[in-house]
From Swiss-Prot:
Homology family: Belongs to the universal ribosomal protein uS8 family.
Assembly mode: Part of the 30S ribosomal subunit. Contacts proteins S5 and S12.
Organism for this UniProt entry: Rhodopseudomonas palustris (strain ATCC BAA-98 / CGA009)
Protein name in UniProt: Small ribosomal subunit protein uS8
UniProt keyword list: Ribonucleoprotein, Ribosomal protein, RNA-binding, rRNA-binding
Gene Ontology CC annotations of this record: ribonucleoprotein complex; ribosome
Pfam families per the UniProt record, alphabetical: Ribosomal_S8
Length: 132
């Protein structure tokens, strides 16, 4: 089954798995999803992920979710820019999530990165989603 919005699909799978207290969740593999997961891992929101190759040639990403005292580390994950309504922000207008306690994940000309990395690199871009 093809998805029209792979980022929303990834976010929904993570949110649903954490509501059910799953330790792992899998999603179809792609470079964009892997780059988003790299950011989430670097920021400490997931334990990690692995690429699983199937004999049919398709790949899946198996994500290890992270919990602290039995509660999900990701309290809130919300899509900002959607295919029907794109949201772009310059470096001066990058949103702060809960006064800096959360992050915004952006797609910039220099790749997918967290908001504080985009500020350091002095680039803006499309605000994909926020995590708290």
């Amino acid at each position: 089954m093809s998805t029209h919005d792979p980022i929303s699909d990834l976010i929904t799978r993570i949110r649903n798995a954490q509501m059910r207290s799953k330790s792992k969740v899998s999603t179809p593999g792609s470079k964009m999803r892997a780059n988003v997961l790299d950011v989430l891992k670097a920021e400490g929101y997931i334990r990690g992920y692995a690429t699983v190759e199937h004999p049919s040639g398709r790949s899946e990403l198996e994500i290890e979710l992270k919990y602290f005292d039995g509660e999900p580390v990701i309290r809130e994950i919300e899509r900002v820019s959607r295919p029907g309504r794109r949201v772009y922000a310059s470096v001066k207008n990058l949103p702060r999530v809960n006064n800096g306690l959360g992050i915004s994940v952006l797609s910039t000309p220099k790749g997918i990165m967290a908001d504080h990395d985009a500020r350091d690199a002095n680039v803006g871009g499309e605000v994909l989603f926020t995590v708290f």
